[in-house]
Amino acid sequence: MTKLKLKIASRRSKLAMVQTLWVKEQLEKNIPNLEVSIESMATQGDKILDVALAKIGDKGLFTKELEAQMLIGKADIAVHSLKDLPTNLPDGLKLGCITKREDPSDALVVNKKNEIYQLESLPAGSIVGTSSLRRLAQLRYKFPYLNFKDIRGNVITRIEKLDSGEFDCIILAAAGLKRLGFESRIHQIIPNEISLHAVGQGALGIECKSEDKEVLKIISVLEDKASSQKCLAERSFLRELEGGCQVPIGVNSSIQNDEICLKGMVASIDGKKLIKDESSGNVKYPEEVGKKLAEKLKLQGADKILSEIFEQFRDK
């Protein structure tokens, strides 16, 4: 039997490599005559660690270098945390597969002296670390008395900063903590009523060349239908709002019978304005549900909030 070969482009961070190795193992397990290799590299978002993500102002912070490898023929696919993948992709590339989603929730991680608290009971002035404007806006809206501070670096670096006493607690994606073996550090899964998660959070997205039918067939073995439907609705919502991965837009999606329900939120960075609504529709047309919800939020002023945020970062 002829050996098939596939090369994956991946970020070099520990979490990215854990995720990419999982994809490699699953593909080789499902396709016995497939040989998968990995080309890892640092992206712009990995290199710039002294500036808040939103201030860098690039929608492809963690993806551009991987996409370049595919476009010049040095890689067949790229594995991304789907939440980092922009909704508009370069010409010639497409989102070929969405894997089964891990828990998409945000999680509270605390240092030892704060183990007696939940997020809702943290004392006024507690220092909360997050690099996400989405988390920041929602938490400021709910808990204006807390002190929020930007935190950069990979998951392990952030936990080290927390344990050294620089922060009282930090907010991270539950999925990343679980994949890295830090599930025991999850002190609280943050309820949707407090913080809606990022678009695509918890799922992996496999990007490939649009016309590469052989590769599309190979990666299709990892496609999870329900996860894909939810994430496509979420990505359609984000695309319609013309938001990027770093703006204060949150979502939560669920499927019951043949209906998909999508909740969405847009907030100002200071947490003073927050618009939330939901939309539902046939699970066969998830992108229509996302578009419908975006239109509902636009009618309530979401456009104005996002324009003010983009203007704010253009001025800096």
Curated annotation (Swiss-Prot):
One of its GO terms (molecular function) is hydroxymethylbilane synthase activity. Gene3D superfamilies: Periplasmic binding protein-like II, Porphobilinogen deaminase, C-terminal domain. It comes from Prochlorococcus marinus (strain MIT 9515). This is Porphobilinogen deaminase. The lineage of its organism: Bacteria, Bacillati, Cyanobacteriota, Cyanophyceae, Synechococcales. The modification S-(dipyrrolylmethanemethyl)cysteine is found at residue 245. InterPro entries: HemC (IPR000860), Porphobilin_deaminase_cofac_BS (IPR022419), Porphobilin_deaminase_N (IPR022417), Porphobilinogen_deaminase_C (IPR022418), Porphobilinogen_deaminase_C_sf (IPR036803). Keywords: Chlorophyll biosynthesis, Porphyrin biosynthesis, Transferase. Belongs to the HMBS family. Its EC number is 2.5.1.61. The keyword Transferase applies.
